[in-house]
Amino acid sequence: MLIELQQIVKSGLVRNGAKHCTKRSLLCSNASVIASKRFQGSFAPGQQQPLNPLAKPIEQDRDAIIRILSSIGSRREVEQYLRYFTSFEAQRFAIIKVGGAIITDELDTLAQSLAFLNHVGLYPIVVHGAGPQLNKILASRNVEPEYSDGIRITDAETLSVARKVFLEENAKLVDALEKLGTRARPITGGVFQAEYLDKEKYKYVGKIVKVNKAPIEHSIRAGTLPILTSMAETASGQLLNVNADITAGELARVLKPLKVVYLNEKGGLINGETKKKISSIYLDREYDGLMKQPWVKYGTKLKIKEIKELLDTLPRTSSVAIISTKDLQKELFTESGAGTLISRGFVINKHDSLDSIPDAALENLIIQKNSLAAPSESLKQFKDTLKDRKLRIYSDSFNESVAIVDTTDSSLPVLLAFGAADNNWLNNVVDSILTTLKADFPSLLWRLQPSAKNLEWFFSKSEGTLFANNFYYFWYGVKDLNKISKFIQSDKPFADAIIQTQSTKPPTASSTTNNPSSSQINQKRSYSTSSLFSKNKKMNRSLFLKGGKRFFSAEAQKTQKPLKAVSSKPAKVVLLGARGYTGKNLIGLINTHPYLELSHVSSRELEGTKLPGYTKKEIQYVNLSTDDVKKLEEEGAVDAWVMALPNGVCKPYVDALTSANGKSVIVDLSADYRFEPSWQYGLPELNDREALRNSKRISNPGCYATGSQVGLTPILSLIDGQPSIFGVSGYSGAGTKPSPKNDLNVLTNNLIPYSLTDHIHEREISYRLKQPVAFIPHVAQWFQGITLTINVPLKKSITSRELRNLYQDRYNGEPLIHVQGDVPLVKDNAHKHHVSVGGFGVHSSGKRAVIVVTIDNLLKGAATQALQNLNLSCGYDEYAGIHLD
């Protein structure tokens, strides 16, 4: 049987394989926003203020960055921000070198960008030049600038003019920042000590020999941005001119920042032959060849040379970016970046034998960290399986990443294993490995399970994908798709072996967490299939009490297995109500989905504008009427409709679709149809998945309701009385329409109760569980994420361990429900697709239990759950397009 292939062609790949549509207006706060009151700390006389004046930055400012990245970037970009920028010392965040032309031509843009960074608690150090301004004044005096090896020859007259110009340009930038409410400090001396570079040749040009950090540290302690000139002094006080690029580099050697950024009007280095901007330069591989290029001369040659000498002294993770002013935030906060990124790169070693890598490292990467499908349970078994294969192995210098390619069939090499330590996913080592693979193999194929971590990264690196044999098959460079078809047909025994291995092996700590000790600390339980529990009586001991009598609930014994894919046919989706937070998150999920694609997005407010963050094709917002909707349905142009509309608005559209007698699916995210028996209730983990697969009308549950039902279902038969649910949501749950519930001026240092009785979710929870509950919602100052503290009166006594085991057994095999022993936290669950259940407190009487649930209201509470329901109704794997933690 021929296998239907879907060739997904991606365009516009940039630096790390993903293109993000970033609007500067999203990132550059306007003056009225930036000019907010800054945090002022109080300290006793003589007490030294901490180096970071915002030891606890305003939480909503951090949320702003995370929210922006969630909208325009990838999960890895959010992780990079959280990992680096929320922990990096303020003075080590970034050094930004500003060319003189930037201050003349783009002062407002520069000031807004710097003010934004400062507003979210970051303190970039600015070093600026003034070359064009200096040349202009010299030209008015009929003085021709002289250069040698890219260095300005500075005589006494030039030095005198330079001093005046530097002070004026420094004052301009400081004043522009102060007007935006951002405190800035001019530092025009006392930082750089220099000696004459070559007095006879260059005259008053210096070579920096010492950097005094104190003025910079004092500036940051005072809560001001340090703005430095590139002038230096000798030990005796003689003023010397120093190239601003060199000055920024010398400062970076001392401070060792995460990023060094050079702003220039061209927005990067331009290849003199192709006239195109260079996206990236890996110096370890490209430096020698680059310096021989005829177009690399004068200032360009000096710049590249100085950058190499700088990066040779910094950690390998450091980089230098040459970008335009408007792309500053994009470079700092997204992995796609902008302009030209220069780094040393990561040395990738090549081997022909698995024995070239130490067994301990290889076992960790292949058995525990491997993202690709592999049936081996031990390193020995893995090696035995491949002993007759021709292999090519790639690893980094520290053996923290490995890729293994089977080259036995040279016409279609297969990537068998790809394992990497967590930090290597964040610092782009994996990208260096893939770049090397693409250089060595014009075509390559690999396979992943739907639950694989970093699935979206592998998707972004491919040119085609197909779901078959319960795997995602990815490839690039394959021209003859019959090869793919034949490989997939022959791969079924391998797929069956994977499934058999997973269904029989006992759970291990490594299957749940990368750190064995964390499973003991958090008491998280790893999941396997239900057959394990029916065979293993020891693991089922928690279901029995004195005398072997079972009394725990039948709900705890239910196992609803996720459904496998029965289709790989692409589907066109229309999103009505795309302006809100849920709509934006759903757009992001569909953007990386292997089969779904948007055909229309409807928003009255945004009609006619381009849809950001969607790269499969260019789409503009439209404003669809009920007649438009009916016509599209009659034409059969749409496979699925998602209604992301406010409560009470959906019905006219549903009626229009129904009148057209179409066959498309409707997933409604509002509360309008949650109580309609003719609609399926879309909470797959607690309902009939087959019914959802066969339904054309699905009502998406509410966010509070999803978390509450997950928190109560395993113990329904033990409840004695009315449970009470104390719910707190981030302000994204209040929507985008301005109100006190999403006004940060009201929410800061505050918690607002609302709808104290008869909230729609109280009714929904009670209706679905057939158990009355009391629900009290609150809104807090964080952006997204919900915590639910559920108090449950019990009929019979129970211990905390027995309670936890009920939940573990009920949600065994559900990848989007995580059960843990300790209390789950909102910040750990935010931006994650799963629900976390934990705490499991039991009163000393044993008759009252408290369960804590966290859920991301925009993902599993809305967009992720909608995608689950779309996947089921369209016949796809339930978790297609969903990253499983």
From Swiss-Prot:
Residues 503-523 have a biased composition (Low complexity). SMART domains: Semialdhyde_dh. The kinase activity is inhibited by arginine. The active site is at 703. It catalyses: N-acetyl-L-glutamate 5-semialdehyde + phosphate + NADP(+) = N-acetyl-L-glutamyl 5-phosphate + NADPH + H(+); N-acetyl-L-glutamate + ATP = N-acetyl-L-glutamyl 5-phosphate + ADP. Keywords: Amino-acid biosynthesis, Arginine biosynthesis, ATP-binding, Cleavage on pair of basic residues, Kinase, Mitochondrion, Multifunctional enzyme, NADP, Nucleotide-binding, Oxidoreductase, Transferase, Transit peptide. InterPro entries: AceGlu_kinase-like_sf, AcgluKinase_fam, AGPR_AS, AGPR_type-1, Asp/Glu/Uridylate_kinase, NAD(P)-bd_dom_sf, NAGK-fArgBP, NAGK/NAGSA. Transmembrane segments: none annotated. The gene is arg11. Residues 503-532 are annotated as: Disordered. Pathway: Amino-acid biosynthesis; L-arginine biosynthesis; N(2)-acetyl-L-ornithine from L-glutamate: step 2/4; Amino-acid biosynthesis; L-arginine biosynthesis; N(2)-acetyl-L-ornithine from L-glutamate: step 3/4. One of its GO terms (cellular component) is mitochondrial matrix. GO terms for molecular function: acetylglutamate kinase activity; ATP binding; N-acetyl-gamma-glutamyl-phosphate reductase activity; NAD binding; NADP+ binding. In the N-terminal section; belongs to the acetylglutamate kinase family. It is found in: Mitochondrion. Residues 1-59 form a transit peptide. NCBIfam families: argB (TIGR00761), argC (TIGR01850). Changing residue 345 to P: In strain: 975. HAMAP family: ArgC_type1. This is Protein arg11, mitochondrial. GO terms for biological process: arginine biosynthetic process via ornithine; L-arginine biosynthetic process.
